[in-house]
């Protein structure tokens, strides 16, 4: 828990950055943008943030306007009043005043602290009182402060003599604040905003080593500070957050640690080791004791004991008590158990889910109080807070090396000093003798984002597949290098040949195709060399000794080939059937890549995108392992009994199971797995890395079944297909289990035991099945144990005839079949089917004739908009910025400058969470009949996702025209894709805001202008400056007139209306 005065100091610093105060509703965001943490008001004993702010009047002054909005202002104190006075005195000429008046981004705030450090140095006796410095500022407007200030780009001013020493306040700022990674992706880069200080040469060279400050204490020199930091890290050998080192330093030595020192820690390898841990767009830094210990240093035991004696005498009783409590509740065994759980969730685990997983795994209760203070686990995992609720955090496991060190893992290999020195000497000699070794070639940089394509050039082992990256950044560079090598060695035929080849040497090789390749010598055998051309193609070739030549021309070009591993195929890498399948599917093909793990040998999923449908190569190769004896071989005109229907789709197709040897074998294997898992900790088999095509286990109705992951919607929700029943559902990642390794081969070799089929003898113009017919079929064939069927045609799906199993075979007549009965029911319903419209006070619903509306135009709504959803069932309208204000938005749809849809950027996280909950609920819920009415709210399934929609019209043949309320899109969907919208999904305001671009004249926009506008703004985060709000009775019908600003380009703000006007002028000139 943070100290109250520490939080108050940080809060005062946040409030000082805004001249006009900060609204209470934005205070948490501003606090976190500066410190990287939320205001822990609940930990401090307050129910609300306003109550906490009201309890510290010496720090915060509260103002409440006529509308009831609360604004917080900083209260001046002796530590900061002189800064405010000095700033006001220079407000007309000094651009530094912008740092005190405006709400700053993180990087500028840190630069302000550097300015205050410089001012503190000026009062040192060693400095002249007439010190001047020049400040050059490149000011970039922030999204929520896009205003123009008229000031000079540089000015010179003098620090006044009367300015007393400013005592700097240290508060925990996460090291991430100094990284560009903290700035959100939608916010522009301010990296070019720099300060340049030019100090006069008035330094007193005879100044003493340490100087006095206003408090009378002596400031230690650099050597003493470094020794103190070493002492702190020797006690905390499990690591200390860089953001916490200043606090621990102050509590231990009763002195503040300068921010300049914090910035220099990364450049002091003899003092500490800094490890960077990335999670998403954020980067954290952890300090560890220096790995290189000088020979003169005492042993580890003596050093630890000495450092503990030094620090324990200076640590306060409060800190000591808290550390004892932490050690009592967070033992090494407990933390190791937490690590074992988090390792299975590399994409992160919600903190509130940890207690249940812990109890399931270890049959012990999760310690109380840990969730309220997740920093106790910070040495083994990264805690990412997503709201002001402490439990609403995501935990990420740290790297293995970091975790082992944090858990005091001492079982490490000790290398004797003599052997180590000999090895280092040999390594240095080899580098001097062969400077062109492979280590001199730059490593291949794996693309960090965007689509990645590779060329598969060697498939000898799926665990070491040889690929070459293709694309403009790779293929072009490779071809250019080959051309240069060919030109160089062709002109320099006398280039020195290898006289004494050595293993590991990098050489150039002339191939039969008149090309020159880079290679490394891997063996020398009786005047013949074995080379590995892995700098380019990774193939092992043998040449005569005189053939290779020294490669000094292209050593600095990075390799374009790399080894990779195909996930899911590791266990079967030695199977010849699998190797043949991999070669058939991938060899010498350009494939798309999904990178699951970035390591020395990255883990991939390959996709063949050359056809109409993308083929998952990993999943396809597994099918080569199927045991042919377990496959279902159906014969035409053959009667099969004891058939079970397992799934019926909305288009009338179905999946069936037949008694077979494969089904019996599958049941036997799943029973053995069930018995095995009963005696194991099931959490050990949690799916840690889900990907499309992965085969897992899912507990359905008390029995384990095989499922294949088909869609990954989010970190929690997945779309799966039941391999042996044909059902499709959405499940949570935590509900899936890995197949135990000892049963993996048995499970994979059994082919799917469900066959896809359809009914025979249906009229050719049946068309789309009506919902009533599908429901009738499900009621009559699902959950019945036995049927008889006869195969009529064998295609990609079987065309079947069905009979009830209890009918004797002698009575299997055509008129008694399910086919004929469903046929009659289908046409009976098509004659009088209607879509009901239930609105109070409305006329009876219109009937359909043969599935068609009375109106001839199928695109015209069958029912006009009459009546709207009651106000109590509609969520509150989305709060917007005031006229003239700025807000971050995301443009989801862009038709033309006169109509586009924006979403508030800060609410996108909440919307994604809502969509995830809807997917999980509706995919598992039973379908219910729905009374459709216009202007009513529903949940609709569109492209495998569930959305909140309002029905705009009812079309013929069971189609609906709907408007997606959170994305602003119009869609036409089938009526069977609609379900009631629950109350819990109506709380979040609808996110789509209709908008019109300000600054341009309203007109009939041409297709060319619309396309240019759409390509410029659609699917992009921008800044909106609202000029007008046109209210409406329905929240989804109101419209805003706004400017749009693109701030993604450093140092440049692109106003979209200027871009549109310029584009229109160019189009006019072209005409």
Curated annotation (Swiss-Prot):
Q: Which Pfam families does the record match to this protein?
A: OST-HTH, TUDOR
Localization per record: Cytoplasm
Superkingdom, according to UniProt?
A: Eukaryota
Keyword Cytoplasm assigned: yes
Output the Gene Ontology cellular-component terms: P granule; ribonucleoprotein granule
Which residues does the UniProt record annotate as the domain Tudor?
A: 500-557, 689-746
Annotated GO biological process: lens fiber cell differentiation; lens morphogenesis in camera-type eye; P granule organization; piRNA processing; post-transcriptional regulation of gene expression; spermatogenesis
Q: Which intervals of the chain form a coiled coil?
A: none
MF annotations from Gene Ontology: mRNA binding
InterPro entries tied to this protein: LOTUS-like, OST-HTH/LOTUS_dom, SNase_OB-fold_sf, TDRD7_LOTUS_3, Tudor, Tudor_domain_containing, Tudor_TDRD7_rpt2, Tudor_TDRD7_rpt3
**Keywords for this protein:** Cytoplasm, Differentiation, Repeat, RNA-binding, Spermatogenesis
Q: Where is the composition biased (Polar residues)?
A: 298-314
* Every HTH OST-type domain range: 3-76, 221-289, 330-399
Query: What is the annotated tissue distribution of the protein whose record heads this document?
Result: Highly expressed in the developing lens.
Q: Where is this region: Disordered?
A: 295-318
Name the protein family: Belongs to the TDRD7 family.
PANTHER family per record: TUDOR DOMAIN CONTAINING PROTEIN (PTHR22948), TUDOR DOMAIN-CONTAINING PROTEIN 7 (PTHR22948:SF14)
The record describes the protein's role as: Component of specific cytoplasmic RNA granules involved in post-transcriptional regulation of specific genes: probably acts by binding to specific mRNAs and regulating their translation. Required for lens transparency during lens development, by regulating translation of specific genes in the developing lens. Also required during spermatogenesis.
Q: Which protein are we looking at?
A: Tudor domain-containing protein 7
Species this chain originates from? Gallus gallus
């Amino acid at each position: 828990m943070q100290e109250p005065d520490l939080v108050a100091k940080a809060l005062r610093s946040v409030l000082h950055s805004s001249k006009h105060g900060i609204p209470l509703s934005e205070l948490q965001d501003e606090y976190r943008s500066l410190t990287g943490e939320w205001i822990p008001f609940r930990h401090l004993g307050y129910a609300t943030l306003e109550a906490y702010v009201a309890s510290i009047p010496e720090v915060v002054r509260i103002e409440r306007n006529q509308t009831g909005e609360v604004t917080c202002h900083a209260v001046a104190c002796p530590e900061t009043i002189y800064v405010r006075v000095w700033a006001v005195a220079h407000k007309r000429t000094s651009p530094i005043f912008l740092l005190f008046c405006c709400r700053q981004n993180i990087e500028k705030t840190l630069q302000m602290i550097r300015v205050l450090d410089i001012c503190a140095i000026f009062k040192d006796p060693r400095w002249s009182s007439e010190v001047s410095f020049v400040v050059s500022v490149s000011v970039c407007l922030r999204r929520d402060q896009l205003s123009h200030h008229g000031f000079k780009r540089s000015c010179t001013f003098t620090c006044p003599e009367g300015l007393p020493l400013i005592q700097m306040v240290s508060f925990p700022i996460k090291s991430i604040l100094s990284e560009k990674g903290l700035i959100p992706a939608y916010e522009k880069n301010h990296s070019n905003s720099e300060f340049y200080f030019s100090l006069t040469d008035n330094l007193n060279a005879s100044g003493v080593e340490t100087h006095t400050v206003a408090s009378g204490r002596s400031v230690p020199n650099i050597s003493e500070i470094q020794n103190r930091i070493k002492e702190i890290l020797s006690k905390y050998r499990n690591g200390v957050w860089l953001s916490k080192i200043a606090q621990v330093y102050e509590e231990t030595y009763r002195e503040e640690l300068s921010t300049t020192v914090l910035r220099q820690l990364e450049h002091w390898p003899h003092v500490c080791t800094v490890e960077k841990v990335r999670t998403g767009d954020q980067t954290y830094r952890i300090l560890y004791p220096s790995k290189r210990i000088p020979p003169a240093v005492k042993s580890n035991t003596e050093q630890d004991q000495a450092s503990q004696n030094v620090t324990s005498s200076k640590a306060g009783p409060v800190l000591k008590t808290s550390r004892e409590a932490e050690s009592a509740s967070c033992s090494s065994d407990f933390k190791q158990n937490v690590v074992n759980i988090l390792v299975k969730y590399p994409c992160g685990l919600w903190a509130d889910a940890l207690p249940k997983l812990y109890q399931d795994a270890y049959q012990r209760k999760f310690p109380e109080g840990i969730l309220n203070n997740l920093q106790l686990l910070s040495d083994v995992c990264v805690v990412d807070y997503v709201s002001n609720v402490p439990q609403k955090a995501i935990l990420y496991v740290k790297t293995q090396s970091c975790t082992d060190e944090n858990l005091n893992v001492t079982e490490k290999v000790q290398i004797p000093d003599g052997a180590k020195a000999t090895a280092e000497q040999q390594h240095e000699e080899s580098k001097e003798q062969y400077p062109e070794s492979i280590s001199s070639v730059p490593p291949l940089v794996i693309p960090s984002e965007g689509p990645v394509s590779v060329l598969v050039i060697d498939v000898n082992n799926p665990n070491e597949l040889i690929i070459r990256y293709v694309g403009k950044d790779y293929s072009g560079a490779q071809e250019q290098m080959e051309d240069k090598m060919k030109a160089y060695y062709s002109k320099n035929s006398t280039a020195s040949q290898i006289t004494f080849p050595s293993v590991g040497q990098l050489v150039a090789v002339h191939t039969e195709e008149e090309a020159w390749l880079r290679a490394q010598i891997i063996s020398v055998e009786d005047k013949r060399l074995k080379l590995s051309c892995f700098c380019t193609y990774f193939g092992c070739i043998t040449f005569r000794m005189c053939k290779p030549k020294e490669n000094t021309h292209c050593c600095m070009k990075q390799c374009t080939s790399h080894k990779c591993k195909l996930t899911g195929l590791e266990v079967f890498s030695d199977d010849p059937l699998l190797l043949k399948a991999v070669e058939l599917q991938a060899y010498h093909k350009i494939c798309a890549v999904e990178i699951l793990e970035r390591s020395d040998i990255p883990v991939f999923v390959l996709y063949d995108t050359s056809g109409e449908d993308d083929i998952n190569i990993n999943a396809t190769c597994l099918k080569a392992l199927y045991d042919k004896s377990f496959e279902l071989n159906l014969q035409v005109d053959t009667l099969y009994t004891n058939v079970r229907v397992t799934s019926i789709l909305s288009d009338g197709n179905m999946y069936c199971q037949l008694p077979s040897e494969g089904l019996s074998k599958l049941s036997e294997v799943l029973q053995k797995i069930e018995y095995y898992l009963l005696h194991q900790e099931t959490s050990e088999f949690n799916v840690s890395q889900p990907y499309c095509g992965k085969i897992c286990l899912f507990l359905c109705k008390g029995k384990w079944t095989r499922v294949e992951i088909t869609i990954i919607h989010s970190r929690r929700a997945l779309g799966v297909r039941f391999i042996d029943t044909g059902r499709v559902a959405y499940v949570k990642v935590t509900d899936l289990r890995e197949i135990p390794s000892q049963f993996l081969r048995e499970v994979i070799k059994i082919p799917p035991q469900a066959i896809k089929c359809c009914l025979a003898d249906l009229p050719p113009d049946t068309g789309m099945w009506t919902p009533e017919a599908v429901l009738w079929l499900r009621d009559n064939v699902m959950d019945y144990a036995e049927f008889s069927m006869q195969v009529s045609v064998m295609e990609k799906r079987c065309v079947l005839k069905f009979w009830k199993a209890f009918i004797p075979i002698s009575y299997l007549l055509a008129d008694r079949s399910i086919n004929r009965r469903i046929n009659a029911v289908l046409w009976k319903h098509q004659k009088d089917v209607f879509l009901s419209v239930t609105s109070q006070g409305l006329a009876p619903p219109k009937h359909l004739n043969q599935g068609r509306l009375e109106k001839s135009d199928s695109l015209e709504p069958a029912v006009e908009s009459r009546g709207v959803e009651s106000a109590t069932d509609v969520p509150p309208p989305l709060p917007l910025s005031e006229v003239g204000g700025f807000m971050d938005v995301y443009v989801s749809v862009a038709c033309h400058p006169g109509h586009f849809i924006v979403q508030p950027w800060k609410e996108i996280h909440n919307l994604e969470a809502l969509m995830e909950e809807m997917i999980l609920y509706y995919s598992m819920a039973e379908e219910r009949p729905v009374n459709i009415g216009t202007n009513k709210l529903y949940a609709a399934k569109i492209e495998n996702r569930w959305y909140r929609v309002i029905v705009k019209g009812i079309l013929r043949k069971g189609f609906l025209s709907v408007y997606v309320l959170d994305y602003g899109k119009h869609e036409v969907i089938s009526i069977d894709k609609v379900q009631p919208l629950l109350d819990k999904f109506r709380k979040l305001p609808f996110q789509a805001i209709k908008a019109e671009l300000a600054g341009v004249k309203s007109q009939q926009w041409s297709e060319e202008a619309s396309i240019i506008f759409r390509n410029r703004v659609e699917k992009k985060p921008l800044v909106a400056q609202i000029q007008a709000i046109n209210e409406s009775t329905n929240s989804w019908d109101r419209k805003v007139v706004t400017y749009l600003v693109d701030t993604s380009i450093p140092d440049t703000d692109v106003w979209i209306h200027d871009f549109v006007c310029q584009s229109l002028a160019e189009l006019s000139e072209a005409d």
